[in-house]
Amino acid sequence: TMINGLGVLGWGVGGIEAEAAMLGQPMFLPQPVVVGVRVSGALPAGTTATDLVLTLTEKLRAHGVVGSFVEFFGDGLSSLELADRATLSNMCPEYGATAAFFPVDDATLTYLRFTGRGDAADLTEHYTKEQGLFRRDGDPEPVFSEVLDLDLASIEPSLAGPRRPQDRVALSNVWSSFVEAYRDHLEPGPKPSEIGRFVGEGGQPEPEEALPGGEVDPAQTAGEATIGDGSVVIAAITSCTNTSNPSVMLAAGLLAKRAVEAGLSAKPWVKTSLAPGSRVVTDYLDAAGLTPYLDKLGFGLVGYGCTTCIGNSGPLPDEVAEQIEERDLTVAAVLSGNRNFEGRIHALVRGSYLASPPLVVAYALAGRVDVDLTTEPIGHADGTPVFLRDVWPSPDEITEAVTQAVTAEQFRAQYARIFDGDERWNALDSPTGAMYAWDPDSTYVQEPPFFAGLDQADAEPTDVIGARVLVKVGDSVTTDHISPAGAIKPDSPAGRYLLERGVGQPDFNSYGSRRGNHEVMLRGTFANVRLRNELAPDTEGPWTTHLPGGEVTTIYDAATRYRDEGVPLVVLAGKEYGSGSSRDWAAKGPSLLGVRVVIAESYERIHRSNLVGMGILPLQYEAGSSASSLGLDGTETYGVRGIAGALQPGLQVTVDATRADGSVVSFPATVRIDQPAELEYYRNGGVLRTVVRGLLP
């Protein structure tokens, strides 16, 4: 989505859609609503493009732009450099839009020429001006379906969290937002994670005696680390969004320089890292002489690409992890990423905040979120308090650093060898031939079961009868909740699978790295450590209740039992189901577990498409209706009438929920198969089966 900042219209698709397109299937997109964002003013001193994009994400999520195109216009665009625009466009999935487009103007041409693409700039300028597409200040306003206003002068230093990218919070209110989100974990009494642990050890979700509780202990020493509730244990400069912006990256380096010169250092319990999205970043940090200061604070280069932002931070120091687990501490991460969904960053980190790279450095120095960085010191040097304002670089300093350190030659040199690879990459052996040779002993790649039985005709979809609810969740359940990409726990179904095959815990790697093995991925479905399944009250993690017996067990084990019993499965959800990453396994996994229907209040665009693409029927409650308003608790037996025979896009079907006492709640739901082609995919058991069947003689 970042290319939209350059005036190139593009949008993301699900992995299942992409696979189908590679095999010749057409792509379908309903005519979108186009929301215009009128931009005015300029960013105040002390604010960054990150503060702007977090404010925009909050604003657009509140307005509702799922499935819409967003287009920016107005004279305020002249104050935004191309890198700032790319930051806004790249975070488009977080506010739910299909695309976030900037028109071509002088800033676009300046960027193209600066990055060594002068010929492309000349052609772009000539073409867009001839076509009337070139933006100038004072142009007549385009016509949009809806228009919102964004005053850049109103932007303030911000973070977003601790659970969702749209939950923007002013810098001065970070601690209050943390307390509000985790009050139950910070106050005396049993915590959901403790109850979940007892369940995992064979206990009951409601023990006869209260679980150990009490006042939150004062911070205690773990090795050299003094940590407590609210401690920052991960501070990561990462993500394609922010590390592609020279202004915020050099601001982080300048802040690090001032902090080191003031005698400050990162707190010892904070795991710090730098993972830019481009090699050009380290080139200009080196050229500015700022790399040694970042290194001094622990922000050494760990690689280029997705790391902490997708859950690949690696383990915390042993003494820190032990304190978190033994005392059930509620700790935080601060990162310059796009996504901070629960359980995504690290299994031991409950709350995560998105922030600009310089604020990430500041929180590494402070080491905690129970601090107001606008009024309290970030640290002390020889007993003297040092405040954020003392080390924050001025706009002139940042501009000077960008001017002196960022050069066109850096881009040309890196682009020229972008596909070369290093010695280790080039030394890898790659298989040849038209057919892949499956290795039955591989724990990374296994032949998937999606094409089993293609020699037989698929049965027509039938009404759902006697289904049970596997998972019942609330609003904003993300694809990370459904199919996590991070670390695999040894006591999880996926971990036990790997151990049984001789894979030691140090070699578990992550769910994301093992997505070529369906046996791992179906065991990891709904395995997020922060999942709150209402069918297993007072727990967090991959738990559910097997019905009608009432046994609390893992979601994978319950699904296996239901499969053996011939019971189809249903998922009940709230609003924004499937938001976040366009993760195809968030649809493939539930399909393999036996989920036939999802009933939600609303869906994220790509996830809805992926569900259909895997043969799962997405149903949507009528406006104003929900599981709660209908009095559904998930223990009912479900039937869906209207699937057999006459199923059509947008059709209204009837859902019957039968309670244990025999009473029935019947309610209408809309079939969220939105295109005729999707109906064909659904009838064939999914898009992959449809495509492959079409290739067979």
Predicted segment positions?
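Acidic, glycine-rich flexible loop/linker segments
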Residues: 378-395, 607-681
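Extended C-terminal subregions enriched in glycine
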Residues: 269-291, 295-308, 312-314, 521, ...
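Mobile "lid/hinge" segments at catalytic clefts and subdomain interfaces of large enzymes
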Residues: 1-136, 151, 248-251, 256-268, ...
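Structural motif
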Residues: 34-36, 67-71, 98-101, 147-149, ...
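NTP/phosphate- and nucleic-acid-binding module
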Residues: 505, 509, 513-518, 523-552, ...
